[in-house]
């Protein structure tokens, strides 16, 4: 025997004033010379900053992002590409200026989403521009 139940569906966003919310330009999947891209780690971050992004996650193959001002940390043996071309990272001054928006006087900062990594790590070719 089939029993019908009555459900009441409520919109959890009914009380949200959408006019007061902002949109954030975000990239959650970015590669650099720390793995299989041809653009240097620090240059990639600056390019996204210059393009007006608010949030950026560096997610290189087999490389953990511990902060844009820290040397990208390879997982030994699994990350081969960055052995060929050594990535550079931001200075502490550049890092602070990008975070708070004073780098090139943009007026708003860009958030560093740390601990990004792409887990398929054994990449031997430069697959990204």
Task: Report each predicted region and the residues it spans.
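A metal-dependent hydrolase metal-coordination microenvironment
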Residues: 4-129
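Active-site microenvironment of metallo-dependent hydrolases
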Residues: 1
């Amino acid at each position: 025997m089939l029993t019908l139940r009555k459900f009441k569906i409520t919109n959890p966003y009914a009380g949200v004033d959408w006019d007061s919310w902002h949109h954030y330009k975000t990239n959650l999947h970015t590669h650099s010379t720390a793995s299989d891209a041809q653009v240097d780690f620090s240059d990639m971050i600056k390019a996204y900053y210059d393009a007006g992004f608010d949030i950026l996650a560096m997610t290189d193959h087999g490389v953990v992002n511990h902060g844009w001002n820290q040397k990208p940390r390879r997982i030994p043996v699994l990350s081969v590409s960055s052995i060929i071309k050594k990535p550079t990272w931001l200075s502490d001054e550049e890092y602070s200026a990008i975070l708070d928006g004073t780098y090139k006087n943009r007026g708003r900062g860009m958030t560093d989403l740390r601990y990004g990594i792409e887990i398929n790590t054994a990449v031997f070719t430069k697959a990204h521009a």
